Amino acid sequence: GAAFLQKPNWQPDTRLWAPDINYINGKYVLYYTLGHWDLPKNSCIGVAVSDSPVGPFTDHGKLLDYNSGTMQCIDPCYFEDNGKKYLFWGSYNSTSKGYEGGIRYVELSADGLSIKGAVSEKIAGPSIEGIMVHKRGNYYYLFGSTGSCCEEERSTYRVVVGRSKNIEGPYVGKNGT
């Protein structure tokens, strides 16, 4: 079924995509993108809550937008570490369209519904999106997609991974770059 009974309308001329649902403090919290493929300044990340993972979700509005440190406010990824909650996001840059991409993160409030800290500097990118963060042992792993997508057999889209001893990076591959 649909996550929302009615699509959030606080950001006009956008589409809904890239959901990330997490169980936080007894509630299901949905982070989602409202964006426009050709208008990165319109991209935002919203947050919604439900008692059930299948919804319906109650929208709590905008969490991040292009004024939050990046014009590519898409592809949210929730991560919790040592009792702290974080949201990672970001995507490609496009100098031809006048914006810089990359991956950033911010610390969230205890309930995950608002921003607690300052937005990080770019920790990965500029050509990576759809990331997922995982911790194993003493390392943080950042998985993401890179390459050209949506070109059928000519697509070079693939998954890459980098690791770091710190959540803020740098995330490097096995060759150290």
Feature locations, PLM:
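Carbohydrate-active catalytic/glycan-binding domains of CAZyme proteins
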Residues: G1-T177
